[in-house]
């Protein structure tokens, strides 16, 4: 009997998720986070979510056929102060395919804080470099609407939506 129970546990789907809803001025995006393969990134993201950190921030980088990025800037492109950076979980086996969420970072390996992106194409060249920690489970039409927004360069920033795309809130389901 113990063998059967152990076998059932080992062969079951071990993918554990935390589900969230992100409401933007373009619509709602449903998200699932992988807290098994990306526990540090997931805990970090949830810390910001629970603090309502993302409320009022914009998608500041929108590159059609690549990514939409958010999580750190206000509408005037000033940066919101963050917690300390986390370790990079880029080698967790998750791939930067369409609809997945990854941690944005600087050129420093362990520099991710609050910013994240949603892949709008299969960007497997990012695998092993940028940590994937979740996926879109509903609202890809909203992701596509954001991806297709008109953009311009503003100061030091490129690919900024002409009309701000704002996160109203991100909440756990």
Enumerate the predicted regions with their spans.
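Low-complexity, intrinsically disordered regions enriched in charged/polar residues
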Residues: 1-4, 80
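Sec-dependent N-terminal signal peptides
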Residues: 3-12
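Cyclophilin-like peptidyl-prolyl cis-trans isomerases
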Residues: 14-173
């Amino acid at each position: 009997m113990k063998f059967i129970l152990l076998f059932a546990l080992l062969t079951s789907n071990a993918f554990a998720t935390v589900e969230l809803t992100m409401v933007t001025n373009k619509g709602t995006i449903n998200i699932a986070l992988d807290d098994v393969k990306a526990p540090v990134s997931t805990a970090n993201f949830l810390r910001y979510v629970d603090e309502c950190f993302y409320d009022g921030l914009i998608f500041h980088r929108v590159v059609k056929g690549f990514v939409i990025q958010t999580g750190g800037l206000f509408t005037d492109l000033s940066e919101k102060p963050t917690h300390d950076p986390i370790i990079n979980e880029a080698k967790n086996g998750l791939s930067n395919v369409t609809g997945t969420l990854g941690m944005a970072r600087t050129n420093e390996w362990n520099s991710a804080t609050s910013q994240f992106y949603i892949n709008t194409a299969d960007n497997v060249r990012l695998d092993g470099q940028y940590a994937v920690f979740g996926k879109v489970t509903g609202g890809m039409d909203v992701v596509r609407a954001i991806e297709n927004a008109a953009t311009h360069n503003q100061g030091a920033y490129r690919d900024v939506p002409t009309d701000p795309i704002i996160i109203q809130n991100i909440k756990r389901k």
